[in-house]
Amino acid sequence: MSRATRAALAGLLGALALGAAAPAGASAEAAAGQAGSAATAGTASAGAPGAVTDLLRQPRVAGEGRLRWFGLQIYDARLFVTPDGVDIERWTRTPFALELRYARKLLGEDIAQASLKEMARMGFGTEAQRAGWLDTMRRLFPDVSAGDRLTGVHLPEGRAVFYRNDTRIGRVEDRQFVEAFFAIWLDPRTVAPDLRRSLLADPAAAARAGASPR
């Protein structure tokens, strides 16, 4: 694999790996088409991991999807919610967990950098805040290999707890950071709208919000 190809792949792997950014030279719209084309509607599946059951009440799968890029499988994503579901219009007030199971190796630095790019693209934070967020993500996110899971648990009051597999790797209490981070997947402005629809596929959850997944 050439250096340019590795750089582009790292951009998209960080792209929605724990952060979303278009590959070098591609527009956000083009990245959405490449990534979202293989996202599939989620259905309830295997039980929630311990990292989720410890923090969420009776967690269940609201939706799941697979991210591919030019035929390469990047990761499988699952969104766990409580019996109350997720309020699509006000998800920042809702407890949930996002689990990503990787299909290939990715550096933690790529995850942090790509996440920051997407937060900035959507207009979250000042330049000074984002510099602090990058430091936080560099401390949080490890390198991952095929089969590894990274899970972010979103809690009320602007808190989040992160796990690698079932080992806790950090906690953040910064409402603006937490909203900006999970917006990468759940905000309507995401570069992978098909994956968002898959994660929010549970019709009962949508009905509770008084809206349907976009």
Regions found by a protein language model. Name each.
Residues 10-20:
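Bacterial N-terminal signal peptides
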Residues 4-5, 17, 27:
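Short linear motifs in low-complexity or flexible loops
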Residues 1-11:
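Bacterial N-terminal signal peptides that target proteins for export
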Residues 25-214:
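Terminal leader/tail segments of proteins
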